[in-house]
Amino acid sequence: MIKKVLDIKLNVKPVFIMFAHKYYFEGPCRMTGGEALQPGFDSIVNGAIFNGTMEGINFSMPDCVNVMEPVFMEPTCDWDIKDEYFDKIFEDEPEVDVYLASGAFGADQIYNEFAQRCKKTIMIMPDIWGPARAGYFYNTGVDVICEPTWPDLARHMVVLRARKAIREANILLVTRFNYDLPVAGATDSFVNLKDVTNKMGVHFRTVNAHEIVDQFHPLTEEGNHTTPGRVTPNITEEEIAELEKVADELFAGAQDVEIEKDMMVNSLIAHKVIQKNMDLYDCSGCVIPCPDICSTRRMNKEKFTFCLNHSLNLEQGIPSACEYDVAAAVTMLAEIAISGKAPYMGNTLPIMATDPRGVNLQLLHMVSEEEYEKVKDMDNLYVVYHSTPHRKFKGINEPDGSYAIRHFAYDQKFGAVMRHDFNEDKGQEITLARFSGDLKRMMIAKGTIVQSVGYDQNNCNGGFIFRVEDQQKMYREQWRSGLHMPLVFGDYTQELKMLAESYGMEAILV
């Protein structure tokens, strides 16, 4: 089964450890008078607090949270501590991700012992007394989170869901030569994937690239060339017929089409085979080494690329990275979980003043002079481009955006690629991020879309120019992080910062 990030829920169990006085008396532990001192009054107040708070919890929790059955207990001024209290709290602990706890003055011993026994994250329900509750937890090594307001807490819940989604993810690695890094492409990615698993929990499932390409044709009785006699998830004749219809639908919705249908179907077959392998290995994303596979000449023979596969995966909330960029794929996991939007990954490069027009010479093949003439202020510009735009920049569950379909190969015109006119999004704020290859930091940046580029071009050229606050600062940080900076529409810098710091990484904001 394909495990989609947005299907992951954070299981949150509210715990109310209240307190009730059994007798009438006054003194330094009673801060009221009149009827409030009478036995039974505390229980009335505690019940009202419980009902009102639960109503607030159900209202304020983000969609990614599953609120579990709450626990309510009311120890007394006998200072009673009973095992049954903890049995009740922890009866469904294996399913719990986070305990959302509230403790009344007087119930401190039970509240603190609950924390000592707990093996999961505890979030303190927001109120001004939070530090009094959280201080003991923190000082004794409990994984505790204390936020001042409910919106702050809800945002932190989103970050915790992202951690869970990453921890439970399996990423399909289509390999040719190496496991950790490609021969060509994203050699600035994670240096050691075992370290990634140890730190973040995500696991990896490998499939040989030649086996994948063999599966682009229906399985024969003899099996595939690379796996003779074995049953493999090859494309079927029925699936090819369905993909013919998918091609027609994609053509009908596109603003512009510049690829023949048979070439389009070839790329859809590649996508279908990747998804069948992801389904087989319970994966949440995939990474493919396009240069490493390209040199086999099998893409040239079969007339396809994996570009459309990445676009269609991303639209479904499935991280999908080219150039075997595992760091980008894991970053995408985080961005999807936090934003609910489909990321876009591309070459992320500064536009330096290297000639009178301020155009990087190495970008002239992609960014036309006409496009640059539309950019009046040349300060602090970056450009991002690749062949994997899509229709879900505004949200995975939002209506499709506009798009065009072109081809990758200039001469033979194979390899379907999507295009999006980012001029429709001028002024849109974006968040870019990337985990560093040594797992020591996460670079997080903001920008604003200025001008679309490459919309009318083929090959690996679709993207946009954007403006950052300080180009030099961004570049000086980027060289420690890597080329591809997966991005999403909107400002999610604080959530990504919280996520990085939760892993003990340095969060670099530029």
Which ranges hold each PLM region?
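Cofactor- and metal-binding active-site motifs of prokaryotic enzymes
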Residues: 72-167, 178-180, 184-189, 359
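Short Gly/Thr/Asp-enriched flexible loops that form oxyanion-binding sites at enzyme active sites
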Residues: 107-118, 295-310, 462
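Short hydrophobic segments within beta-strands
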Residues: 15-19, 124, 172-174
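Extended hydrophobic packing segments that form well-structured cores
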Residues: 12, 392-510
